[in-house]
A protein has these predicted regions:
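Gly/Ser/Thr-enriched, mixed-charge loops and adjacent short helices
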Residues: 56-173
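N-terminal small/polar loop signature for handling phosphorylated ligands or for N-terminal nucleophile
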Residues: 1-55, 134-173
C-alpha cells in the first residue's frame, strides 16, 4: 500500500511545484534527521505507524522537527479537495544510500562500553532493516525476532503494544 501512496504523494507535490527528495524506505526519526541533514523545507512520509495492514496514511510537517497537527491536516485536506492549490512544475530526486548515512550517524555518535544483549522484535516491519544494524554497530549483542521485512506481517502487527509481539519478546528474554 505504501509504495502506491508514496507515488501519488510525489506526483501531487511535484504538480504544485515542489522539489521532492526521496530518501526511500525509512522510519520517522530518519525522516526528521533527513529534514535537517538535507536542509529540506518540509517533510512528507507515507506511514502505517502501528496500524493494521492496509491502513496507511501520510505524516507531514513544515517546521523542522514538527509534524502537522490535526487542524493543519484538516486545512490541507480542504485545500486539496477544493482544488485551492497552486500548480507548477516540480521535480523529484532519489537520494541513494540515505539509510546508510542515517545508520552511520547514529552508530558514530552512540558507542557503549558495557556489553548489552538486546532482544529486537520488529514484527517483520521497517524497523527490522535498521534496529539490528544500529544496535550491533554501537556494541550490542542482538537477538533478532522477526526482523526480516515482510509486509504481510505473518506473525503479528509490528506494534510494540501487540500482545503476540510482547509474548515473543518475553520468550526470548
Amino acid at each position: 500500500y505504501s509504495e502506491e501512496i508514496s507515488e501519488v504523494v510525489k506526483i501531487g507535490l511535484t504538480s504544485t511545484g515542489c522539489f521532492v527528495e526521496d530518501i526511500g524506505l525509512s522510519l520517522s526519526p530518519m525522516v526528521y534527521f533527513a529534514q535537517f541533514n538535507l536542509d529540506a523545507d518540509a517533510i512528507a512520509m507515507v506511514t502505517a505507524s502501528h496500524n493494521e495492514n492496509g491502513w496507511t496514511g501520510v505524516k507531514m510537517g513544515i517546521k523542522k522537527g514538527l509534524t502537522h497537527a490535526p487542524e493543519e491536516m484538516k486545512e490541507l485536506k480542504n485545500i486539496t479537495l477544493n482544488k485551492k492549490f497552486i500548480e507548477g512544475k516540480g521535480s523529484e530526486k532519489q537520494i541513494d544510500g540515505f539509510q546508510e548515512v542515517y545508520k552511520k550517524n547514529l552508530i558514530n555518535k552512540n558507542k557503549i562500553d558495557k556489553k548489552i544483549r538486546a532482544v529486537v522484535a520488529c514484527g517483520n516491519g521497517t524497523a527490522g532493516i535498521f534496529a539490528p544494524d544500529i544496535l550491533e554497530g554501537i556494541g550490542c549483542e542482538v537477538i533478532q525476532i522477526d526482523c526480516k521485512l515482510d509486509y504481510t506481517f505473518p506473525k503479528y502487527n509490528p506494534n510494540p503494544e501487540d500482545l503476540k509481539m510482547l509474548n515473543a519478546i518475553s520468550k526470548a528474554v
